[in-house]
């Protein structure tokens, strides 16, 4: 080991009052959801015609939150630690012990969004486009929280100047892969989709943004996984791939299908509108 940046000594607990503690991870969820709520309102109002009312956006936040938490937890249980939870089923609802899966959360949010739109008679494609536009914002804050917690760290990288020794990652300096993911899945995808929505006619054919999000996230995750240490209970799979990469491949394929189908549809009959 020639050089390693010191890992910032940040307490995972932001505020502790008696038996109650607010962790950075919880704060990341709150900031991501509230930021997404505000941005969804902004995008809906700018659309012509508006995608939904402000009251609908408020209700969608509740549906999306439940979908994220339930789907994320069940996804982790099924994809990443099924044997453990089969032996200890009472631990499944113990979210404070950690263990959430993005891919499970995605399925949960999609399910919640479809059910919500059907209950309000809203366009699934138009609402879905807005959800896809705001999702990278939540991913950005979530990955920053992973970094603060010192979890989901990268693979050993003793020759990388910005490598860090993580508290639970052994003596070797490692890639700060959480920051890579925050950049790719968060900032880059957020800016790219936002620019496409603002300066192209993609929103005239609802569903195209959804497809691009699925493709963009899948490619970003597969790339970041080359630097991220796989989960200890799973390790590397066949040919050295990781579970995250395997789960991201169907996302890319689904994104291509969604984009092509949406692109072939008739555009919204709103001259110059979004």
Curated annotation (Swiss-Prot):
Pathway noted in the entry: Protein modification; lipoprotein biosynthesis (diacylglyceryl transfer)
Main location: membrane
Gene Ontology molecular function: phosphatidylglycerol-prolipoprotein diacylglyceryl transferase activity
InterPro entries reported in the protein's UniProt record: Lgt (IPR001640)
Residues spanning the membrane: 24-44, 60-80, 96-116, 122-142, 182-202, 207-227, 241-261
Binding of a 1,2-diacyl-sn-glycero-3-phospho-(1'-sn-glycerol), residues: 143
Protein localization: Cell inner membrane
Family classification: Belongs to the Lgt family.
Protein name per its UniProtKB record: Phosphatidylglycerol--prolipoprotein diacylglyceryl transferase
Species of origin: Rhodospirillum rubrum (strain ATCC 11170 / ATH 1.1.1 / DSM 467 / LMG 4362 / NCIMB 8255 / S1)
